[in-house]
Amino acid sequence: MDTKTTPLIHAKLDEKIISSYNDANGLDIDDLWDIYNEKTRRMIHIISQRYKPKKQSPFPVIADENVRIFPPLHKTIDWAKKRNVEEQNLIEQSITESQRIFSEKQRLEQERFNRELLEKKRIEAERQRLKDEEERRKKELMEKEKKEKERIRLIEEQKHKENEQRRLKQEQIDAKRKEEEAREKRMKETFKDDPEEDSNMAWSIIHKIKTEVVAPISEKKELKNYCFTQKRKITPRLGQITKSNSQIMKITQLLQQTFQEARNTDPLVYKWVLNFFCKSVVKQAEAEVAVNPISAYPLAKVCLLLQTQNADLKDLLFARLQKNCPWVIPFWYDHGTENGKKKMGFKKLSDGHWEQNTTYNERQCGIFAVYAAILSLDDSLAPESWRTFSRLLNLPSPSQLMKSDLELGQTLCSIVSTYLDIAGQSLLRIYGRQAKKLIVCSFSEAYLGANGGGSQYGRLRIVGEDWMKGQGGLKFSFEP
């Protein structure tokens, strides 16, 4: 249909509508006009059928078959205008509805797009989360495996270290055992368990120190000065010993450092320092242990620890203890002579008289307590402990000495009481019933006598009663 020939029927298309259809559907202007004209014809036909006016004659008509009457022209024009307006409205409504539908489609499409975009983002985020979770899990697994490997490595390293420590400890035990066996064999061959020969051997060690160590050092001023410097380090440290294991280890390390410095300086200096240490132990025993016997244990432990690192110290310390206290062997000398009294451990006072027996007993018990503590703290010395105690009991008994030499009998009672207090429990623990027989013998009536003899005899009887009650021996334990 030609749009130029029907200006009243066709309205001018809105440029915005044309633009929107063109952009949305990809149609050009000619396509839109074709669509528009087709729809317009249909609507005009529908409207013309609906609003078709009834034919009325505006004025009376005389029938004549050859006459054709038309309605007035102004009515026809008005009707065409009215119909054109209605059609225009319908067209605009149709276009508006089409725009609404299109907008709704766009909105729905946008919503769908947004949903898909959100879902895509959600899926991507979930995928990333799972990826991160997997990486984290792998990292944790790797870290766990690493820690487990490290733990296993540390355990293996600790096991290796413990095995090495056990091996070294066993080697030390074996070496110590072999050394003790060799020493025991040497002692058996040398001493033949004869107290007098043991005493002579100890005195020979003292004589050797005097002639081969002390005398040469005295002639060398430089070495002598060095020895006196080391001397000032040893004495105060012995006074600092307590029952604390940590303090004992500290003092032992300081003393060993002093010994090592002396060893590095000169072999004679080393032996001189060891000899002075033994002298200091004796003085400490006379001053402190004589008053407080339980303090013998810490001092004895320091001596034992140092003996493990200084092979010459054991025999030298034994010789020094025996020189000042012959009861450690034990062996008696003829104390009726000045030389015999000196060898029995008596001290001569400045006025030329010998010390009183009470003072002598206290000093002898202090020195003997240190020796008994050494025997009790080291189980490998149990044979020596048994031999020492049995030798004491093989001496003339206190009941015999009560009539012949009461002071000597009192000293013997004090020494036996000291052994029972310090080393009795150790002997009983190692030798059991046999040790119990020996202990009971030491305070029996046959050995001690029923009564009399003074305070020393009485104390040994009280000690025996405590042992019979199962309460014998001093109660002592080291602290951390």
Curated annotation (Swiss-Prot):
Location(s) in or outside the cell: Cytoplasm; Nucleus, Nuclear pore complex; Nucleus membrane
Coiled coil spans: 91-190
Biological process, per Gene Ontology: poly(A)+ mRNA export from nucleus; protein transport
Keywords: Coiled coil, Cytoplasm, Membrane, mRNA transport, Nuclear pore complex, Nucleus, Protein transport, Translocation, Transport
UniProt feature, compositional bias: Basic and acidic residues: 128-193
GO CC annotation terms, alphabetical: cytoplasm; cytosol; nuclear envelope; nuclear membrane; nuclear periphery; nuclear pore; nuclear pore cytoplasmic filaments; nucleus
Main location class: cytoplasm
One Gene Ontology MF term: inositol hexakisphosphate binding
Membrane topology field: Peripheral membrane protein
Superkingdom per UniProt: Eukaryota
The keyword Nucleus is annotated on this UniProt entry: yes
Keyword Coiled coil part of the UniProt annotation: yes
UniProt cross-references to InterPro entries, sorted A to Z: GLE1, GLE1-like_sf
Location of region: Disordered: 128-196
Functional description taken from the UniProt entry: Functions as a component of the nuclear pore complex (NPC). NPC components, collectively referred to as nucleoporins (NUPs), can play the role of both NPC structural components and of docking or interaction partners for transiently associated nuclear transport factors. It is specifically involved in a terminal step of poly(A)+ mRNA transport through the NPC.
Quaternary structure annotation from Swiss-Prot or TrEMBL: Component of the nuclear pore complex (NPC). NPC constitutes the exclusive means of nucleocytoplasmic transport. NPCs allow the passive diffusion of ions and small molecules and the active, nuclear transport receptor-mediated bidirectional transport of macromolecules such as proteins, RNAs, ribonucleoparticles (RNPs), and ribosomal subunits across the nuclear envelope.
Family per record: Belongs to the GLE1 family.
Protein name as it appears in the record: mRNA export factor gle1
Organism: Schizosaccharomyces pombe (strain 972 / ATCC 24843) (Fission yeast)
